[in-house]
Amino acid sequence: MKTVTFEIFRYDPDKDKEPYYQTYQVELRRPGYLMLDALNQIKWELDPTLTYRRSCREGVCGSDGLNVNGVNMLSCMTKVEDLGTEHIVVQPLPGMNVMRDLVVDVDDFFAKFITVKPYLIRKSPNPDKEIYQSPEDRKKLDGLYECIACGCCSSSCPSYWADKKYLGPNAFLRAWRYLADSRDEGADERLPILNDKHGVWRCHTIYNCVEACPKELNPTEAIMNIRKMLLDTEI
């Protein structure tokens, strides 16, 4: 049975003056052993004080984003063996305040998400039946609606780290999901928000967000589409 060394970021603000790293030896007990399996093994068998988020175990809830060997990923979608190393460094998502160990404060992240009004806005009178959307228009939403708000994209972005008011790639992807929706009539409300100095123009097209997304979505493309809409629209 293969053993892998895990070096994990630890910090309890109630008792620690500074963060530190703690090392654990983890057994890979079956093929396809996940990062989440390894963290569970540590917590359940070695150190019950280790704190991290988890929920669905199926890449749906988005709660278990981590930084592993310098790359943001979901613990429930990452096989330990795929990392190709026997020494794994696990840290909280960068650019976010650490609450304890691997748990970060996501309040600001979701506040920025809400800022772009991530819901359908209708100005026309409600019709007597559902609002029709053609298959072609529905197809335009592929690659947009699948976001699970895990934070891997925004926390990989240098602009997000440097500018605490920058909305970030997650918010922009969500904004474009509705701007691209043929049923939505809220562009006049969203575009001024996105055109702000902390909006889409602060993106430097580094593409970290694209590399980090566990759902293989493209926030940078969404940002470019929003920029084009801004240039084509008088606001």
Predicted regions and their residues:
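Short strand-turn-strand beta-turns centered on an Asx-Gly dipeptide
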Residues: 27, 67-70
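Short, structured protein-protein interaction patches enriched in aromatics and acidic/basic residues
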Residues: 56-65
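Eukaryote-biased recognition of intrinsically disordered, low-complexity regulatory segments
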Residues: 2-24
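A generic structural motif
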Residues: 79-80
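Ferredoxin-type iron-sulfur electron-transfer modules in oxidoreductases and energy-metabolism complexes
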Residues: 32-48, 91-235
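Short, contiguous acidic and Ser/Thr-rich linear segments
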Residues: 22-33
